[in-house]
């Protein structure tokens, strides 16, 4: 099946990924974003979320790996590069210990010449047991080769 036939279709849903406190702490160290809502368990327990929460950018960073999992080699290229993100919104904080997954819908396919193709995918990072997603974004990928 040609990939353009899948425009408007759900490509799939990734596996659930636990947002452990260890993952959050590691991200805080890597990015030097050690705000108390992320790393101070005692203070966060008294805060608005009742526990620590993941950085929005940590949740966003999981999009790359989950996209690779969902899309796999269906794009028919040797490699895919991050091209950009449109309409990114952080909707619901992800509490420590929660699980997230990525639901992916192919929005568009645009040939860019020289064997390159620009793909636009609607990504929704869902939180297990929550009606509202963690984030929504239109993710752009450039496939080549």
Protein language model annotation of sequence segments:
Residues 58, 83-90, 121-127:
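Hydrophobic alpha-helical segments of small multi-pass membrane proteins
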Residues 13-15, 23, 33, 77-86, ...:
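A generic structural signal for short beta-strands and their flanking turns/coil linkers
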Residues 48-51, 64-105:
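Hydrophobic beta-strand-centered segment that forms part of the acyl-chain substrate-binding groove
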Residues 2-6, 93-145:
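HotDog/MaoC-like acyl-thioester-processing domains
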Residues 1-54, 68, 145:
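Catalytic strand-loop segment that frames the active site of acyl-thioester-processing enzymes
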């Amino acid at each position: 099946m040609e990939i353009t036939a899948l425009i408007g279709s759900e490509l799939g849903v990734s596996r659930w990924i636990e947002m452990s406190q260890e993952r959050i702490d590691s991200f805080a160290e890597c990015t030097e974003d050690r705000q108390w809502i992320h790393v101070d368990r005692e203070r966060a327990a008294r805060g608005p979320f009742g526990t620590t929460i993941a950085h929005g950018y940590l949740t966003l960073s999981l999009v790359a790996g989950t996209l690779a999992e969902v899309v796999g080699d269906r794009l028919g290229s040797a490699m895919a590069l991050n091209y950009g993100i449109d309409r990114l919104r952080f909707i619901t904080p992800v509490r420590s210990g929660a699980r997230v997954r990525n639901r992916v819908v192919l929005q568009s396919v645009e040939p860019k010449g020289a064997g390159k193709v620009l793909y636009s995918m609607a990504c929704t990072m869902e939180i297990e047991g929550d009606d509202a997603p963690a984030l929504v974004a239109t993710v752009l990928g450039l496939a080549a080769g």
